[in-house]
């Protein structure tokens, strides 16, 4: 029992899900999803704070990629009025866009996981990793990027394993 009820692993175990690997564990008290794997049943689960964990099959994974510096576009063609409105609406976003323009800084980094929904359409689950400017030449950037790439590799390996199972291992 944790401070706020059952632990995530206990909630998952109650649903027949056995955590064999934590692909990504979000920092405590954040609104970021955690992702767990059950290799035995070829399932994975997403847990968001305050919600019941959602269990998915490997075959539900459509794609996974790391997205960097996705923000508003501050370009030279922007009128002064448009730029002024952008600054008023979100000054931090404009500052980050300018910092990331030359490629020297990473201003945001997200792992974007595309998953098959109940209706068969894809929906995107984002895991934000970087929210402030980080110099691309820094060790911190390299650690974040390596971690993001590892999460994507693990998720895509699950998808590929499901594809092999459907095609009979060919």
Question: What does each model-found stretch correspond to?
Answer:
Residues 1-54:
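Anionic N-terminal interaction surfaces
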Residues 64-170:
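Acidic, Ser/Thr- and proline-rich intrinsically disordered linker/docking segments
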């Amino acid at each position: 029992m944790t401070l706020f009820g059952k632990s995530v692993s206990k909630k998952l175990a109650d649903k027949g899900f056995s955590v064999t690997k934590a692909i990504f564990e979000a920092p405590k008290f954040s609104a970021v999803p955690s992702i767990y794997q059950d290799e035995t049943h070829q399932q994975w689960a997403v847990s968001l704070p305050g919600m019941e964990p959602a269990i998915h099959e490997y075959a539900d994974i459509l794609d996974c990629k790391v997205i960097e510096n996705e923000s508003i576009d501050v370009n030279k063609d922007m009128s002064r009025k448009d730029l002024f409105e952008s600054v008023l609406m979100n000054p931090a976003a404009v500052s980050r866009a300018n910092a990331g323009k030359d490629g020297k800084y990473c201003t945001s980094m997200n792992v974007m996981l595309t998953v098959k929904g109940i209706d068969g359409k894809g929906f995107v689950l984002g895991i934000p990793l970087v929210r402030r400017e980080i110099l691309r030449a820094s060790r911190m950037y390299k650690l974040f990027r390596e971690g993001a790439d590892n999460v994507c590799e693990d998720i895509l390996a699950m998808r590929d394993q499901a594809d092999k199972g459907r095609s009979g291992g060919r």
